[in-house]
Amino acid sequence: MSKKKSKEKYPIATISAIVVIVLLVLTFLCISKPLDTKSYKIESRKSEVAAYKEKNTDYIVDGWLKVQGTNIDYPVIISTDDVSINNMLDDFTWKEENPKELTKRTVIYGHNFKNISSTPLITDSTHSRFEQLISFIYYDFAKDNQFIQYTKDGVDYLFQIFSVSLIDDYDLIQSGYLDEEELKDYLKKSLDDSYFKYDIDVDENDKIITLITCTRFFGGLKSTRFKIDGKLLEKDEKAILSKVSTKSNYQEIEEILKGGKSNEKTA
């Protein structure tokens, strides 16, 4: 009788061992799997650049800008003495510099006539220029939208965001002509100022893009700029969402956002 029971135990023990091994393998796969494998696919804007250049011969058309998750999908023009940025009716973005090729830092500006909102500004088709850029101040939006597409000279460049910040106007570094040491200093400050920590490596050997707009986030009497920085991805580099977390300085943002719809006043 005891021998029969002993024989019956072996298959059960074997099955149990197999189940344990399978569970361990599945657990390892779940742990080693990236937190998010969502990727971004470039939508070329080469034809849009060509068409806009043909239609607008009075402007120096630099290229095209497209920002993930927003309706920012506009031409980039060069600001000159002959072009009044404040009087243009088209939706556009602009640059103050006109280098022949991609520099260490590309700086692009856009108007914002809206104040902060109680929710990300991504659902209203009437929003224009850089009015939806401020949506990146919201953590959930920032972690799900990380890519900036910039088309110039027949090339669709892709940048991945590594810094989102609000800075005083006098702290704004506007030049794109930075040497490696200057870029190194800029990157340190940009990463320090950022409200989010992106799991992205960036250094002075990279090329970056900076998007800048005005905001009344801290009130109408304070001259504040909203700024996003992204690093250029190489052609063979996959555009995969990185891990994003809030930093301790994000607490001041959370306090302001408690104002809800009262923040939406434009005056």
List each language-model region with its residue ranges.
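N-terminal Sec-pathway targeting helices
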Residues: 3-20
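Intrinsically disordered, low-complexity sequence elements enriched in Ser/Thr/Gly/Pro
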Residues: 1-2, 158
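N-terminal type II signal-anchor transmembrane helix
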Residues: 16-32
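Solvent-exposed, non-transmembrane regions of membrane-associated and secreted proteins
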Residues: 27-267
